[in-house]
UniProtKB/Swiss-Prot annotation:
Catalyzes the N-acylation of UDP-3-O-acylglucosamine using 3-hydroxyacyl-ACP as the acyl donor. Is involved in the biosynthesis of lipid A, a phosphorylated glycolipid that anchors the lipopolysaccharide to the outer membrane of the cell. The gene is lpxD. It comes from Pseudomonas fluorescens (strain ATCC BAA-477 / NRRL B-23932 / Pf-5). Transmembrane segments: none annotated. One of its GO terms (biological process) is lipid A biosynthetic process. Belongs to the transferase hexapeptide repeat family. LpxD subfamily. One of its GO terms (cellular component) is membrane. SUPFAM superfamilies: Trimeric LpxA-like enzymes. This is UDP-3-O-acylglucosamine N-acyltransferase. The active site is at residue 240. InterPro entries: Hexapep, Hexapep_transf_CS, LpxD, Trimer_LpxA-like_sf, UDP_GlcNAc_AcTrfase_non-rep.
């Protein structure tokens, strides 16, 4: 069902300054290029300012400086992107689950399910699990023994929680995610791998989001821990005993090896990899495809790898990289020879 909200109501909801017709009805959100007369748009990135001229949106979320030059209706806010984020939930068409248990769900006799929770078709909830009020568990979810899901949690269809996974309040988990799978732990005995039982669990804080097909392994001894407000994209691998600090965000395909600790307010771009048993301090930004091989103790942005080039140029660069050892050796020899004939023996490049 499409929501219809008056522009004045949206201004009140945001605490925004209304410039225009407060009675105008808004039925959805769209980009500056695509928005129609009943839709709200926003300008967050200056590179899209050029689209304001021909924008057909019913209204636009704008900063004060941009609103001065805009002839159409606007909601003036300090941060248009944040305002868009808040309003987006008012127009979200995602169906709302009704409280209750579907007849096909299988629930252990000693599991505790709050009457205000929604349990979907063919869900399985094992012994000792506790499901709080307002939780939605989608079709075909598996909730293992002694798991706990806090108030307001939302599990899409086909989420798997192995035993002893504890989840905080308002956590969102997308389809295919697996929490509490066995960590990759083996001891080598004369070339033969002997399995190590993974007897820890997984602890997830409040307001966490976990993307499609992301895996968070259980701890070998203590729990794997994900802090409050952490946001995890799709297809992320978090190994056993990893600790992730509050409000850290990770894009798709990040891989974190066992026992690594990541601080608060970090950002890991797509494809980042981290070796095990290292510490990353707070407020670190790792750019895409960065390979982290040692601890980071200073906040800031870090990168590794090579950026894209035209293929022919990249091949030349790769060939030069293979020659670096030889070039360094020849440079040392040249410096030595220059030093032998330079008064005072100074052959450094800065004189």
């Amino acid at each position: 069902m499409t929501a219809t909200i008056k522009l004045g109501q949206l201004a009140e909801f945001l605490g925004a300054t209304l410039s225009g017709d407060g009675e105008k009805e808004i039925t959805g959100l769209a980009t500056l290029q695509e928005a129609g007369p009943a839709q709200l748009s926003f300008l967050a990135n200056p590179q899209y300012r050029k689209y304001l001229v021909d924008c057909q949106a019913g209204a636009v979320l704008l900063k004060a400086a941009d609103a001065e030059a805009y002839a159409g209706d606007a909601l003036v806010v300090a941060d248009p992107y944040l305002a868009y984020a808040r309003i987006s939930h008012l127009f979200d068409p995602k169906p709302k689950a009704q409280a209750g248990v579907h007849p096909s769900a299988v629930i252990a006799a000693d599991a505790q399910v709050d009457p205000a929770a929604s349990i979907g078709p063919f869900a399985v909830i094992e012994s000792g699990a506790r499901i709080a009020a307002g939780v939605t568990i989608g079709a075909h979810c598996f909730i293992g023994a002694r798991c706990e899901i806090g108030e307001g949690g939302w599990l899409a269809p086909r989420v798997t929680l192995y035993h002893d996974v504890r989840i905080g309040k308002r956590v969102v988990i997308q389809s295919g995610a697996v929490l509490g799978g066995e960590g990759f732990g083996f001891a080598n005995e004369k070339g033969v791998w002997q399995k190590i039982a993974q007897i820890g669990g997984v602890t997830i804080g409040d307001d966490v989001e976990i993307g499609v097909n992301t895996a968070i392994d259980r701890g070998a001894l203590a729990d794997t821990v994900i802090g409050n407000g952490v946001k995890l994209d799709n297809q992320i691998q978090i190994a056993h005993n990893v600790q992730v600090g509050d409000h850290t965000a990770m894009a798709a395909c990040v891989g974190i090896s066992g026992s690594t600790k990541i601080g608060k307010h970090c950002m890991l771009a797509g494809g980042v990899g981290l070796v095990g048993h290292i510490d990353i301090c707070d407020n670190v930004f790792l750019t895409g495809m960065t390979m982290v091989t040692h601890s980071i103790t200073e906040p800031g942005a870090y990168s590794s790898g090579t950026a894209m080039q035209p293929a022919a140029e990249w091949r030349k660069s790769a060939a030069r990289i293979r020659q670096l050892d030889d070039l360094a050796r020849r440079l040392r020899q040249l410096e030595k020879r220059v030093g032998d004939v330079t008064p005072g023996g100074n052959a450094s490049s800065d004189g």
